[in-house]
A protein has these predicted regions:
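Polytopic transmembrane helical bundles with strong interfacial aromatic enrichment
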Residues: 1-246
């Protein structure tokens, strides 16, 4: 019930955002006879797929976030929890991977962004949740098999969705200068920032208060598959921090 409540709150927040800032049912008083048309750079079949795939990945990570908040509220987390979270994380990761790949291919043949990857702030905004989502995916495997890394997995669930919201804010707010920015709006960016502060600030506060109460799980040998996955997690987390600081 708590998981569905968190998901409902996220959906309600973005529904309010759409109604207040981009109401699709708002009547135009003096509509222009002809529109300006789409930016020629965006008139591409790949662009009908690239943004939806990215946002399916972002939204998918909200499920892991909701499960993490539910675990913190009830103070209970186990291998069954990881078994529920891992498929959603994998699905979100696949969508985000396909979205990034499609965007890279489009950037390559448009010859405008410096090749496949230019380390542009908007590109980095999608890479950061992908890196953290990869770490979360590996962490849930360790938790499901060994009942370990409970607190770390919950934290990764919160941070992955945090970076998804942060990426949305950076792209839409106009805070950063990017050749990828086609629809920046500071007003809408502030609304997204408010959503980010509410959910992520609340999630991290709840984590700080409730994480010590989570029962620690099993142990595993440092030289093992699980140990390698932990090293992988640390590398991905460090890479995310490096990209964030560079952005």
């Amino acid at each position: 019930a708590s998981v569905l409540s968190v998901q409902g709150a996220i959906a309600a927040a973005f529904l309010i955002f759409i109604i207040l800032t981009s109401n699709p049912f708002l009547r135009l008083g003096d509509p222009p006879p002809e529109g300006q048309g789409l930016n020629p750079i965006l008139a591409d079949p790949g662009l009908a797929i690239h943004p939806p795939l990215l946002y399916l990945g972002y939204v998918g990570f909200s499920v892991a976030f909701a499960f993490a908040i539910g675990a913190l509220i009830h103070g209970r987390i186990d291998a069954v929890w990881a078994r529920f979270v891992r498929p959603w994380t994998l699905l979100a990761w696949i969508f985000l991977t396909l979205g990034i790949a499609m965007g890279s291919y489009w950037a390559y043949y448009e010859l405008g962004w410096g090749g496949w990857w230019f380390w542009d702030p908007v590109e980095n905004a999608s890479l950061m949740p992908w890196l953290m989502g990869t770490a979360l995916l590996h962490s849930t495997i360790v938790m499901e098999k060994r009942d370990a890394l409970k607190v770390w997995t919950v934290l990764l669930s919160i941070l992955t969705f945090s970076l998804s919201l942060l990426g949305t804010f950076l792209v839409r707010s106009g805070v950063i200068t990017s050749v990828h920015s086609f629809a920046s709006d500071p007003g809408r960016g502030l609304f997204i920032l408010g959503i980010l502060v509410f959910f992520i600030g609340g999630g991290l506060t709840l984590f700080a208060l409730r994480a010590p109460a989570l029962r620690q799980g099993g142990l595993f040998a440092p030289v093992s598959r699980e140990g390698a996955l932990v090293v992988n997690n640390l590398f991905l987390a460090a890479s995310t921090v490096a990209v964030l600081l560079g952005t």
